[in-house]
Amino acid sequence: VSTATVSKVLNGRADVSSATRARVQALLEEHDYVGRRTDGAWRSGQLTVELVFDGTLNAYCTEIIQGVLETSATSAVTVALSLRTPAQHHAPQERLTAWARGLAAAGRCAVIAVVNDITTGDLKALARARLPLVVVDPLNLPNARVTSVGSTNFTGGFVATKHLLGLGHRDIAYLGGPARAACNRARLHGYRAAMETEAVPVPEGYVRSGHFRYDDGVTIGAELLDMATPPTAVFAGSDPTAAGVLEAARARGLRIPEDLSVVGFDDTQIARLSSPPLTTVRQPLREMGSMALKTALRLAAGETLESHHVELATELLVRGSTGPPPA
């Protein structure tokens, strides 16, 4: 069967015999092909994009959602929000295929996944359903061709650590997210690179992994502060984690920033409401959400992208949680 004939069947053309049409449809079924119900949507401008989170919504996610919604409001695009747990990403292939087929049948034109653990099974299911995927701040990239939107995490980690070094700190710890997360690895590499530029060694136990959560900052921050030689500064991989470190410091009677300096990452509302306000690396989260939606719509329209990976600039915002080390 020729490509032209398959195209005619997919587009409902009448100039195809019943026998040929049946053969093509059988082949499509055999290869798990799912047609998207978006042709009419493109003509009417009624498009829907699926926005998928990993099962938790926090201040970071809220900023991403805001960026997506602000752009959707000016693009006549509907956004459907859903949550998927890590276990759902690692489900049997038939369940992943059913998930993607369900999205296609519901008229979704693309999927945006935020901080998700994307698997090869996800990619296969979405490809079969002809649903383009854009990942925001991916935990992993199983395929170099996966389109992603993120920020300059390495630069952010480097600048945050250089700021602390510039204040005179030498005992600087890094408390990040999951060790395998791409964004965390980049921030950690930036931290290590900055330490190397000043020939400052990283003591054993000064690099810790968590899940970018407040509780990590409290518990792991306490472990750091209870070390025989505790750090005088902590660079945290997220604002919630940094806020947790502040709490661990207060519980030990430490003053911020006189006794301990803390830097966060993201510049969410948590950073602005902390006491003192948190020095942090600003990720342009709303812009990342906006860029993800624009990119998803371009892919859904069949456009070719200049690059599959977009990184938006980070910026260090110095507030009240950092100062010189104690004398």
Short names for language-model regions:
Residues 44-162:
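Alpha-helical recognition/docking segments in bacterial nutrient-uptake
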Residues 51-52, 105-115, 173-175, 207, ...:
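Periplasmic-binding protein-like
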